[in-house]
């Protein structure tokens, strides 16, 4: 969701994350053609939820009390319900099922809030970490490493940059001596 800069990009992210089926997305896109402001409003709501979740996750990582406004935002998403929504079996996996007909677009965000709440209240919450890249990456991850000592969001991005920076500075310091 971090890179979803437009309503269409947000719908693609929701689809890629398995949170919205193509018929639902088509229904919402058609609705947005008639009411484009609704698309922008949902994107604003999604960004608001993302920022609230980030605050809660960072508070958990830092061991501090979270901003009550962030918890209130997430709780607002947790408390809503859409009759007929639930889990559907898809071969050997599960996916979110939405009712046909009128779907409140903000209901697409509900599984995100539920998943985050499950993470924050479950045993994996203690494995939640923030990337330690010096450029200020800020991405969050769950440290599943055996020693619980992972430092970067990905080794391919921030990890390699940090290691190459460290190597450069060591080589530069060695050249001076």
Regions found by a protein language model. Give the residues of each.
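BZIP DNA-binding basic region
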Residues: 107-165, 172-177
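A generic structural signal for secondary-structure junctions
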Residues: 15, 169-172
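Alpha-helix termini
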Residues: 31, 167-169
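Short helix-coil boundary/hinge micro-motifs
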Residues: 1-130, 177
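Intrinsically disordered, low-complexity regions enriched in small/polar residues
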Residues: 96-98, 143, 170
């Amino acid at each position: 969701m971090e890179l979803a800069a437009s309503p269409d990009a947000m719908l693609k992210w929701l689809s890629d994350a398995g949170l919205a089926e193509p018929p639902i997305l088509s229904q919402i896109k058609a609705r947005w053609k008639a009411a484009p402001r609704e698309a922008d409003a949902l994107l604003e709501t999604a960004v608001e939820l993302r920022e609230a979740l980030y605050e809660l996750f960072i508070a958990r990582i830092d061991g501090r009390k979270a901003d009550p406004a962030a918890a209130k935002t997430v709780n607002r998403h947790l408390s809503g319900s859409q009759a007929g929504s639930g889990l559907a079996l898809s071969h050997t996996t599960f996916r979110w099922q939405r009712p046909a007909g009128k779907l409140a677009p903000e209901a697409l965000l509900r599984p995100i809030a539920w998943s985050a709440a499950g993470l924050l209240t479950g045993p994996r919450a203690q494995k939640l970490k923030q990337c330690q890249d010096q450029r200020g990456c800020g991405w969050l991850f769950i440290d599943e490493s055996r020693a619980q000592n992972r430092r970067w969001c990905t080794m391919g991005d921030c990890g390699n940059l940090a290691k190459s920076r460290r190597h450069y500075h060591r080589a530069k310091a060695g050249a001076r001596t």
